From Swiss-Prot:
GO terms for cellular component: axon; nuclear membrane; presynaptic active zone membrane; synaptic vesicle membrane; synaptobrevin 2-SNAP-25-syntaxin-1a complex. The gene is STX1B. Keywords: Coiled coil, Membrane, Neurotransmitter transport, Phosphoprotein, Transmembrane, Transmembrane helix, Transport. Belongs to the syntaxin family. The lineage of its organism: Eukaryota, Metazoa, Chordata, Craniata, Vertebrata. This is Syntaxin-1B. Interacts with OTOF. Interacts with SYT6 and SYT8; the interaction is Ca(2+)-dependent. Phosphorylated by CK2. Residues 191-253 form the t-SNARE coiled-coil homology domain. It is a single-pass type IV membrane protein. Residues 1-20 are annotated as: Disordered. Residues 1-13 have a biased composition (Basic and acidic residues).
């Protein structure tokens, strides 16, 4: 009799290896989904911080000379947003590189498709929040610039929008303020507010520059993924349509089948009745 011990042992080792690979893959996906939840939490925090920034902007604009506490709170929020945004960007980059490595090895699996979809979704959400933040900063800059222009008018100095932009870009506020006579309290207050708003714009532009490269990088990433996302959404929508049509067709088939069954029963009943009538007629004739 042939000894199959070695063959059975090899088969067992192969099964053990497959089980280890399966367990490792499950563990990897568990870690991936933990990352996804962490990134999602960071994006939600960014969104909340952006809303808080809007409130601080309104508070600062409402006061000619905002208190230091409010300005410090805004600076802290700006720092937190920058820190969280860089963290999200770093984690999304790591996931992207991992996906590219597997694609380079021509690997294709359900897990890889899940990771690509999650990465695309998170990237879009991240860019949406950062776009809102960028729009919030730009709006605040415009409102600060309007305040400067109004205060300059109070001092008797009229400027065009282009002149004001040149001044803000150069950072030379003294071009407009040096020759203003401090002949009234109103003029002094106007100059103080001009200086305050100018300082706010300087801080804003520094923040915008710091986040600019990251914003462009992530926006380009999402744009490159756009076609893939559109294809996924198209397939999902058409899958839903197909399922709905299939359900509708099934209902119609059941309905038609039910009608056919009822017709069949009615025909059988008619045949039985007809048979009874014929039998009775024949019996009566023979009796005669």
């Amino acid at each position: 009799m042939k000894d199959r011990t070695q063959e059975l042992r090899s088969a067992k080792d192969s099964d053990d290896e497959e089980e280890v690979v399966h367990v490792d893959r499950d563990h990897f996906m568990d870690e991936f989904f933990e990352q996804v939840e962490e990134i999602r939490g960071c994006i939600e925090k960014l969104s909340e911080d952006v809303e808080q920034v809007k409130k601080q902007h309104s508070a600062i604009l409402a006061a000619p000379n905002p208190d230091e506490k409010t300005k410090q709170e805004l600076e802290d929020l700006t720092t937190d947003i920058k820190k969280t945004a860089n963290k999200v960007r770093s984690k999304l980059k790591a996931i992207e590189q991992s996906i590219e490595q597997e694609e380079g090895l021509n690997r294709s699996s359900a897990d890889l498709r899940i990771r690509k979809t999650q990465h695309s979704t998170l990237s879009r959400k991240f860019v949406e929040v950062m776009t809102e933040y960028n729009a919030t900063q730009s709006k605040y800059r415009d409102r600060c610039k309007d305040r400067i222009q109004r205060q300059l008018e109070i001092t008797g100095r009229t400027t065009t929008n282009e002149e004001l932009e040149d001044m803000l870009e150069s950072g030379k506020l003294a071009i407009f303020t040096d020759d203003i006579k401090m002949d009234s309290q109103m003029t002094k207050q106007a100059l103080n507010e001009i200086e305050t708003r100018h300082n706010e714009i300087i801080k804003l532009e520094t923040s915008i520059r710091e986040l600019h490269d990251m914003f462009v990088d992530m926006a380009m990433l999402v744009e490159s993924q756009g076609e893939m996302i559109d294809r996924i959404e198209y397939n999902v929508e058409h899958s839903v349509d197909y399922v709905e049509r299939a359900v509708s067709d099934t209902k119609k088939a059941v309905k038609y089948q039910s009608k056919a069954r009822r017709k069949k029963i009615m025909i059988i009943i008619c045949c039985v009745v007809l048979g009874v009538v014929l039998a009775s007629s024949i019996g009566g004739t023979l009796g005669l």
